[in-house]
Amino acid sequence: MEKTLVILKPCTVQRGLIGEIVTRFEKKGLRLAGMKMVWLTDEILSEHYAHLKEKPFFQRIKDAMSVCPVIVCCWEGVDAIHVVRTLAGTTNGRNAAPGTIRGDYSMSVQENIVHASDSPETAEIELKRFFKDDEIFDYELKNLLSLYANDEF
């Protein structure tokens, strides 16, 4: 099963949407393998957003992501990265389709509810950045056969 990182951003925490967003992923059939609240440091933010370092909005993103703690989650499932990104919707909430998380809860390109890993390579790096090995749990999901055909997992 594929694993991916989701960060519930400060705007999600501030608006009291944590439960609703987690429920969306659970209802889809993803398995929550790890979850914790963390306050992102400047060092972690600089590492996480290093690909945006030269952009004029780099500091604004770091400032927004350190307003309050965030919730980091490890979700698991068949094609979990693609599934999570599809559920999340396009980055700009104003353009995201209704029915997606951003389409339903966001009007912003920055305050867009969640961060989601964009590839298996990125997911591996990001999960190691935010979780220790003993913070990711492997357990049997009792409804697995209700979610997938027996040859899909």
Curated annotation (Swiss-Prot):
Family matches, as Pfam families: NDK (PF00334)
Required co-factors: Mg(2+)
Subcellular location, principal: cytoplasm
Protein localization: Cytoplasm
Keyword Metal-binding found: yes
4Fe-4S in keyword set: no
Task performed by this protein: Major role in the synthesis of nucleoside triphosphates other than ATP. The ATP gamma phosphate is transferred to the NDP beta phosphate via a ping-pong mechanism, using a phosphorylated active-site intermediate.
CDD domains to which the protein is assigned, alphabetical: NDPk_I
Superkingdom in the source lineage: Bacteria
GO MF term list: ATP binding; metal ion binding; nucleoside diphosphate kinase activity
Family: Belongs to the NDK family.
Organism encoding this protein: Parabacteroides distasonis (strain ATCC 8503 / DSM 20701 / CIP 104284 / JCM 5825 / NCTC 11152)
GO CC term, one of those recorded: cytoplasm
Positions bound to ATP: K9, F57, R85, T91, R102, N112
Protein name per UniProt: Nucleoside diphosphate kinase
List of catalytic residues: H115
EC number(s) on file: 2.7.4.6
Assembly and interaction partners: Homotetramer.
Keywords: ATP-binding, Cytoplasm, Kinase, Magnesium, Metal-binding, Nucleotide metabolism, Nucleotide-binding, Phosphoprotein, Transferase
PROSITE patterns: NDPK (PS00469), NDPK_LIKE (PS51374)
Known catalytic reactions: a 2'-deoxyribonucleoside 5'-diphosphate + ATP = a 2'-deoxyribonucleoside 5'-triphosphate + ADP; a ribonucleoside 5'-diphosphate + ATP = a ribonucleoside 5'-triphosphate + ADP
SUPFAM superfamilies, alphabetized: Nucleoside diphosphate kinase, NDK
Biological process terms in GO annotation: CTP biosynthetic process; GTP biosynthetic process; UTP biosynthetic process
